[in-house]
């Protein structure tokens, strides 16, 4: 696959906390902004009630009901989960409560997300036991819940496409200046309302103090179908 800058993007990689942590927002920044507070109109209504995007099951796309979490060992996953919970990107929910919350199909199968990493080639490698390892971008594989959601373009429907700029006509001495900047970690700073949890449980259980806990994403996950629409709207509102 080809990335944003035309570079080749590799296959999914197994996650380790040491490789993921450098690419995440700091504690106190991650999951620190309530998305619904900055949203208005159609986007705010969807944030408060994700059922507005939910399709009838007969219209769901063909997709797996659960996806793999890419970690090479239970110990690696436990460390990763603990770090993400500490930052507020994931939260632990008692399994019996999670089982009642999670979105299921008509056969009773829960829809559960996966997780994997993609190399961030421009970041300095991290050292593990003296060996350099690439920093990984944390990706949530949200194919199962995405298959249940309508398309939602909202604010992005009026963004210009690159081809439209070719139709601009300038005077002889006219200059058209465009600037842009990557918004690092922008998905993981926005916390979504509790009503979204049913769509955002991941395919893994942890045990804390003898109790089984299901992990749920609390933020606008990179890979969520309406993620770009939501974050574009939120940043536009901030700049107004």
Describe every region a protein language model picked out:
Residues 238-240:
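Short, intrinsically disordered, charge-balanced linker/junction segments flanking boundaries
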Residues 1-87, 91-92, 164-165:
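Non-catalytic, polymerase-adjacent accessory regions of viral genome-replication enzymes
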Residues 5, 60-236:
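Catalytic-core region of right-hand nucleic acid polymerases
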